[in-house]
């Protein structure tokens, strides 16, 4: 059988919650606010399908550069290229100082 070339290929572990994290996510995570210039970690939450970014960028750290609707624009470095990822607040974690 030919292999899949879809955007969710090779994401069996990236899009799977651990046993203790199953069920609905904490609602506080979905209404979190971030300021411009703040460092955030990109972490996909599989139980929230809306506002997911491409799984290729899972685990990256970037800087919030603005808002787009309810989501945030995050700039990340991909090699020598700066890319902008749009992600809902449920998929972002604030970097600890």
UniProtKB/Swiss-Prot annotation:
GO terms for molecular function: structural constituent of ribosome. InterPro entries: Ribosomal_eL21, Ribosomal_eL21_arc, Ribosomal_eL21_CS, Ribosomal_eL21_sf, Translation_prot_SH3-like_sf. Keywords: Ribonucleoprotein, Ribosomal protein. It comes from the Archaea. Signal peptide: none annotated. Residues 1-12 have a biased composition (Polar residues). HAMAP family: Ribosomal_eL21. Belongs to the eukaryotic ribosomal protein eL21 family. NCBIfam families: PRK04306.1. This is Large ribosomal subunit protein eL21. It comes from Natronomonas pharaonis (strain ATCC 35678 / DSM 2160 / CIP 103997 / JCM 8858 / NBRC 14720 / NCIMB 2260 / Gabara).
């Amino acid at each position: 059988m030919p292999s899949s070339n879809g955007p969710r290929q090779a994401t069996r572990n990236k899009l799977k919650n651990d046993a203790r994290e199953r069920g609905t996510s904490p609602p506080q995570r979905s209404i979190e606010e971030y300021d411009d210039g703040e460092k955030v970690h990109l972490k996909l939450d599989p139980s929230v399908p809306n506002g997911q970014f491409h799984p290729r960028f899972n685990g990256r750290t970037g800087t919030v550069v603005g808002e787009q609707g309810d989501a945030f624009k995050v700039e990340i470095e991909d090699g020598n290229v700066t890319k902008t990822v749009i992600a809902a607040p449920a998929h972002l974690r604030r970097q600890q100082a």
